UniProtKB/Swiss-Prot annotation:
Disulfide bonds: C65-C70
4-hydroxyproline modifications at: P71, P72, P74
Species annotation: Conus grahami
Signal peptide: 1-22
Subcellular location: Secreted
Upper taxonomic lineage: Eukaryota, Metazoa, Spiralia, Lophotrochozoa, Mollusca
Family: Belongs to the conotoxin C superfamily. Consomatin family.
Primary location group: secreted
GO MF: toxin activity
Domain topic, free-text comment: The cysteine framework is C-C.
Protein name (Swiss-Prot/TrEMBL): Consomatin Gh1
Length: 74
């Protein structure tokens, strides 16, 4: 819990530090987002699928383990 609080405080300082130097909030937020992430790229990724997405993959059973206790494989 102490670590989580410390991380939150450091994130708040990291985000608000440029504001104390005369920066605008919009510039600070834009600095947190990578340059290659644009609204056009996000929309394109939502509407267009890669060719590998259309390939039907065989269903592979997934084993779910609880506390390192796994069911036997079939």
């Amino acid at each position: 819990m102490q670590t989580a609080c410390w991380v939150m405080v450091m994130m708040m300082v990291w985000i608000t530090a440029p504001l104390s130097e005369g920066g605008k909030l919009n510039d600070v937020i834009r600095g947190l987002v990578p340059d290659d992430v644009t609204p056009q790229l996000i929309l394109r990724s939502l509407f267009f699928h890669r060719p590998s997405d259309s390939v039907v993959r065989p269903t592979v059973p997934v084993r779910i383990c609880y506390w390192k206790v796994c069911p036997p494989s079939p």
